[in-house]
């Protein structure tokens, strides 16, 4: 007695591909939402004065999937009176894009404080980005569990 397969294999693979794409889209959305939350938290953290608004405006993220741009969030922020933060946005995007392109084989979210002096501000004891990024795993897990 022989067994004969009557299933259309191409339809089976089409369903598998559709489910794979659905899962990928869900994980990409979870990454995006987690990055947005972390960036928003970092921008709301008020431990330093940003006279030019460049440092706070340089905080943002970029998301790439296998080398392809997905989304980003960089916007003007701060209440300083010596600038509008536009330089911060440009620098933040530049640094994030450079970092994201080093991993063209993966889904990658890069969160940055793009001004060159961000590390020095943190070294003085002010929280620019580190405190928010320490919550990244918890925030991402929250969105993944909601899938």
Regions found by a protein language model. Name each.
Residues 1-15:
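Short, intrinsically disordered N-terminal pre-domain segments
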Residues 14, 18-118:
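Short, low-complexity, charged/polar segments at coil/turn and helix-coil boundaries
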Residues 122-147:
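Protruding loop/beta-arch "assembly-hinge" segments enriched in small, turn-prone residues
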């Amino acid at each position: 007695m022989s067994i004969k397969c009557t299933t259309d294999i191409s339809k089976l693979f089409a369903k598998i591909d559709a489910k794979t794409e659905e899962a990928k889209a869900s994980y990409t959305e979870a990454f995006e939402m987690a990055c947005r939350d972390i960036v928003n938290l970092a921008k709301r953290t008020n431990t330093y004065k940003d006279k030019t608004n460049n440092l706070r405006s340089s905080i943002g993220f970029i998301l790439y999937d296998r080398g392809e741009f997905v989304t980003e969030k960089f916007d003007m922020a701060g209440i300083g009176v010596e600038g509008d933060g536009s330089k911060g946005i440009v620098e933040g995007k530049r640094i994030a894009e450079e970092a994201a392109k080093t991993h063209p084989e993966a889904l990658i979210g890069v969160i940055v404080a793009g001004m060159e002096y961000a590390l020095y501000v943190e070294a003085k004891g002010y929280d620019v980005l580190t405190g928010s990024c320490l919550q990244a795993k918890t925030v991402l897990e929250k969105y993944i569990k909601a899938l």
